[in-house]
């Protein structure tokens, strides 16, 4: 979904202001004109209201009533509104749909506006866009929220390059990289941005524009945001460094994208600069390349229906913290290609396996640790509250506990040592200060007050006492005055005119007006039966009581800002500790997964090996286990070199439902798990680094692009054949279906030869074209495998075992019978199949059509099902007999009945 650019008036900008327009609507027009392309949430009392086209868009998106408020140019003004107290829910829904919102608040008290005889002042206090969120209520705790900037450099020689920078301001992550235009789709699928910013030219580009418009939200911006000449200066200004030497080494194109990111953040945060980590450069080729189709087909983070449940991430996510879940998703999106880094992660998982007590103790500690990264981000942009301070306090206390528990490891592996060092970085003085300062029960918002612990600040305690104990203070003063004056009936009262005053009966009034009491008591009012006085002390107390509530809140807010300043001074250390928690959580989660699901440590090296023994599908295995069923494990060896079951291309035949697709996917997932540093579902695994993973498994129409299922399949196959190197792992399922049989067979045949001779990569190729198995005679690295089935009383039993050899039948009719096709259709299909199999290959299509008048049969079947032949009736009757269940007499009767039917036939 695309969002209107913010560089010129958008279609939803109201028409020029006419002469007779209300002051409120005039103010609205001015604010709206300054924020084109955004939905304006305009504060009106307890509601945010939207007008004109904004109202129409929001009403449709939110399913709320569209009404009207007044007129503009003689036309009703469309209006809708949402309650302020529920606005986060509505904002979340709008942002999820890719909209951007400007929140306009009242910035003065309505009473002050009335005194000025003017409309209440309002200003935009927040620009909310899909890629710049920090609030918990708007974020998915288990997923990163990335803003991505894309810059392109044109080259006359045709070597165009794309610079990318992506930021999650809720966690301060900042990453840059470069890629070729052909690699952009795979890179976008890996980053999975919530919002992308691009130039107008790139957004309109005929080649890349359609790809960009598939993203959840795209915001085109003016060229100055992507000005490479000013990029370095803008980055230096943001990070407050003199030169780029203080930041990571970046190419000019990467710096351009990075500068666009920080410029956009500066605009949307209205000048507030959330602290970001210095840009980290991702080296080209450091992660496994996975194109969008492969990510979707393998259901890495979402199923094909868009659900997290049922995906690979859902199956392996045993983390106990939101930050850990986000980091695991990041690793799954970008498996490593560096053998040493993978080994370090595997070492860390292995180190935690022998001690289940330590694992569970650490997981319990982490479970109590809040999301420090996002608390830190909210505090840094002024949107944090007392609970965010408490989150940092609790995180630091949990860090101490985790470090003490990790002391049980004699020699922690490097990955765990790094996490421990990160947990040690913040000063524990911060946790102690927060423990002293923060109350036990904390409000959500700082404006509610009551979050500073009693005894932390003397002046605050005194002010609170004055606020909370005003009655006791006045009562004590009344008793003292009564004693001093010798007037037992003296009272201190209050009204809105005089405020606090001393009241005595008329007969005692003269006494208070005579020396020496007249020096203390000042006459204010004489009534028929009472005389009223005030005192300087009472005036002071009245002022203190009147202002005590405001003063108490003011003091608390001062304390809050001082504590936030302590946080900002320790931002880098706190961020490091938060990442240490996340890394430790992922390691513990993978250790738990390995133990619970019986995974083994893979051998990952720089070879071209791919040898799996006892491999299993991680998601399917869990689903079967829940139903009390076992998963049938299978071996796979795509390693180069001679071997009985070794070939770099496996050609797999067998019926539908037998498990071919599961076998293909499980081997791809095993490779992926190994390269994120996880143990794998197998009894043994040796995997040479896979640099690109390709999957063409399943397809559907792409109606939006005018592509049929077959066209989608061919496009995906073309990508594989054009891009797969010898280090790639390719899984292909049913290439060539969806067109004429011989066309499809020819395409599949040629694709296998291309994989064998040109790509020379490790491949799994499932097919129903049994003729392809003959290729193994001329392609030395092609190995035939089949999925074992067994026939029983005319039905097929799937054994889900992958063995050497090839299938001679597809068992399609048996599968159709299992699916519940009508018996008449199954019977007719068997008849047609028998005749087809009896045909000579050289027989003409016309002769075949004459022998099998299919259209005539179809026409007749539409009126009434064609009855089975007598021979077919006899066969079905025989199948229905169960000799072991018949008595001798019943068996004899059945035989006579069959003979009688045969005679009639």
From Swiss-Prot:
Q: For this chain's UniProt record, which GO biological process terms are given? A: mismatch repair
Q: Which GO terms describe its molecular function?
A: ATP binding; ATP-dependent DNA damage sensor activity; damaged DNA binding; mismatched DNA binding
Recorded hits in Pfam families, A to Z, give:
MutS_I, MutS_II, MutS_III, MutS_IV, MutS_V
SUPFAM superfamilies of this UniProt entry? DNA repair protein MutS, domain I (SSF55271), DNA repair protein MutS, domain II (SSF53150), DNA repair protein MutS, domain III (SSF48334), P-loop containing nucleoside triphosphate hydrolases (SSF52540)
Region named Disordered: 272-292
Gene3D superfamilies for the chain: 1.10.1420.10, 6.10.140.430, DNA repair protein MutS, domain I, MutS, connector domain, P-loop containing nucleotide triphosphate hydrolases
Annotated InterPro entries:
DNA_mismatch_repair_MutS, DNA_mismatch_repair_MutS-lik_N, DNA_mismatch_repair_MutS/MSH, DNA_mismatch_repair_MutS_C, DNA_mismatch_repair_MutS_clamp, DNA_mismatch_repair_MutS_core, DNA_mismatch_repair_MutS_N, DNA_mismatch_repair_MutS_sf
What keywords would UniProt list here? ATP-binding, DNA damage, DNA repair, DNA-binding, Nucleotide-binding
List of residues binding ATP? 654-661
Which Gene Ontology cellular-component terms appear in the entry? cytosol
Described by its record, this protein's role is as follows: This protein is involved in the repair of mismatches in DNA. It is possible that it carries out the mismatch recognition step. This protein has a weak ATPase activity.
Family stated for the protein in its record:
Belongs to the DNA mismatch repair MutS family.
Q: What is this protein called?
A: DNA mismatch repair protein MutS
Species of the source: Rhodopseudomonas palustris (strain BisB18)
The organism's lineage? Bacteria, Pseudomonadati, Pseudomonadota, Alphaproteobacteria, Hyphomicrobiales
């Amino acid at each position: 979904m695309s969002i209107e650019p913010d560089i010129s008036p958008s279609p939803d900008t109201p028409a020029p202001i006419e002469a007779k327009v209300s002051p409120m609507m005039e103010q609205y027009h001015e604010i709206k004109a300054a924020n084109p392309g955004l939905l304006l949430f305009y504060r009106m009392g307890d509601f945010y209201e939207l007008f004109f086209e904004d109202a129409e868009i929001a009403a449709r998106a939110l399913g709320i009533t569209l009404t009207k408020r007044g007129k503009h140019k003689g036309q009703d003004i469309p209006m809708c509104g949402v309650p302020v107290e529920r606005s986060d829910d509505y904002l979340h829904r709008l942002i999820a749909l890719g909209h951007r919102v400007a929140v306009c608040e009242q910035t003065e008290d309505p009473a002050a506006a009335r005194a000025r005889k003017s409309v209440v002042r309002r200003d935009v206090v927040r620009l909310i866009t899909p890629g710049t969120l920090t609030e918990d209520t708007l974020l998915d705790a288990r997923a990163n929220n990335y803003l991505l900037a894309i810059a392109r450099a044109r080259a006359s020689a045709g070597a165009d390059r794309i610079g990318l920078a992506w930021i999650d301001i809720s966690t301060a992550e900042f990453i840059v990289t470069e890629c070729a235009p052909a690699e952009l789709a795979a890179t976008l699928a890996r980053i999975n941005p919530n919002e992308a910013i691009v130039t107008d030219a790139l957004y309109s580009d005929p080649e890349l524009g359609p790809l960009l418009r598939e993203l959840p939200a795209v915001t085109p911006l003016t060229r100055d945001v992507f000005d490479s000449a000013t990029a370095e200066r803008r980055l230096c200004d943001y990070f407050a460094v003199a030169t780029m030497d203080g930041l990571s080494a970046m190419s000019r194109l990467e710096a351009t994208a990075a500068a666009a990111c920080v410029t956009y953040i500066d605009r949307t945060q209205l000048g507030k600069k959330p602290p970001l980590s210095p840009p980290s450069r991702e080296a080209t080729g450091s992660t496994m390349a996975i194109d969008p189709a492969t990510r979707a087909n393998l259901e890495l983070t979402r199923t094909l229906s868009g659900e997290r449940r049922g995906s690979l991430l859902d199956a392996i996510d045993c983390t106990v913290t939101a930050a850990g879940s986000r980091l695991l998703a990041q690793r799954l999106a970008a498996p490593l290609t560096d053998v040493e880094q993978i080994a370090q992660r595997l070492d860390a998982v292995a180190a935690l396996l022998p001690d289940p007590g330590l694992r569970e103790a650490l997981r319990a500690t982490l479970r109590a640790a809040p999301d420090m990264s996002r608390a830190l981000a909210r505090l840094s942009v002024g949107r944090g509250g007392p609970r965010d301070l408490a989150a940092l306090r609790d995180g630091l206390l949990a860090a101490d506990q985790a470090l003490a528990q990790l002391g049980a490891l004699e020699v922690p592996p490097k990955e765990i040592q790094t996490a421990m060092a990160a947990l040690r970085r913040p000063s524990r003085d911060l946790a102690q200060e927060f423990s002293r300062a923060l109350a036990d029960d904390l409000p959500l918002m700082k404006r509610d007050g009551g979050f500073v612990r009693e005894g932390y600040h003397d002046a605050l305690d005194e002010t609170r006492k004055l606020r909370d104990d005003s009655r006791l203070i006045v009562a004590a003063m009344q008793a003292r005055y009564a004693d001093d004056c010798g007037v037992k009936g003296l009272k201190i009262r209050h009204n809105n005119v005089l405020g606090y005053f001393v009241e005595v009966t008329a007969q005692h009034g003269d006494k208070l007006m005579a020396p020496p009491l007249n020096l203390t008591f000042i006459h204010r009012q004489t009534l028929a039966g009472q005389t009223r006085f005030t005192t300087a002390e009472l005036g002071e107390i009245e002022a203190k009581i009147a202002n005590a509530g405001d003063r108490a809140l003011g003091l608390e807010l001062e304390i809050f800002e001082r504590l936030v300043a302590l946080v900002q001074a320790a931002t880098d250390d706190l961020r490091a500790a938060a990442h240490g928690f996340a890394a430790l959580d992922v390691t513990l989660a993978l250790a738990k997964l390995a133990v619970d699901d019986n995974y083994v440590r893979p051998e990952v090296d720089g070879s071209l090996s791919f040898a799996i023994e006892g491999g299993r599908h991680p998601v399917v295995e869990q689903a079967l286990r829940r139903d009390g069923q076992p998963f049938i494990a299978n071996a796979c060896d795509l390693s180069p070199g001679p071997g009985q079951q070794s070939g770099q291309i496996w050609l797999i035949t067998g019926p539908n439902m037998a498990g071919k697709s599961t076998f293909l996917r499980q081997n791809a997932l095993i490779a992926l798990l190994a390269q994120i540093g996880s143990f794998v579902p197998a009894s043994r695994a040796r995997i040479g680094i896979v640099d690109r993973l390709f999957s063409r498994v399943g397809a559907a129409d792409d109606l939006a692009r005018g592509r049929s299922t077959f066209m989608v399949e061919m496009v995906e196959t073309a990508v594989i054949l054009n891009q797969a190197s010898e280090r790639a792992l390719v899984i292909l399922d049913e290439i060539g279906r969806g067109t004429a049989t011989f066309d499809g067979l020819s395409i599949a045949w040629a694709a296998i030869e291309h994989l064998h001779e040109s790509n020379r990569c490790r491949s799994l190729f499932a097919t129903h074209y049994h003729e392809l198995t003959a290729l193994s005679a001329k392609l030395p690295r092609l190995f035939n495998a089949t999925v074992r089935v067994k026939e029983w009383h005319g039905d097929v039993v799937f054994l889900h075992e992958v063995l050497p050899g090839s299938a001679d039948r597809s068992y399609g009719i048996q599968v159709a019978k299992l699916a519940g096709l009508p018996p008449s259709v199954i019977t007719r299909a068997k008849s047609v199949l028998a005749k087809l199999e009896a045909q000579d290959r050289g027989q003409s299509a016309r002769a075949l059509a004459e022998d099998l008048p299919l259209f005539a049969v179809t026409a007749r079947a539409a009126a009434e099902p064609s009855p089975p032949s007598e021979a077919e009736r006899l066969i079905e009757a025989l199948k229905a007999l169960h000799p072991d269940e018949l008595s001798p007499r019943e068996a004899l009767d059945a035989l006579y009945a069959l003979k009688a039917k045969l005679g009639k036939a």
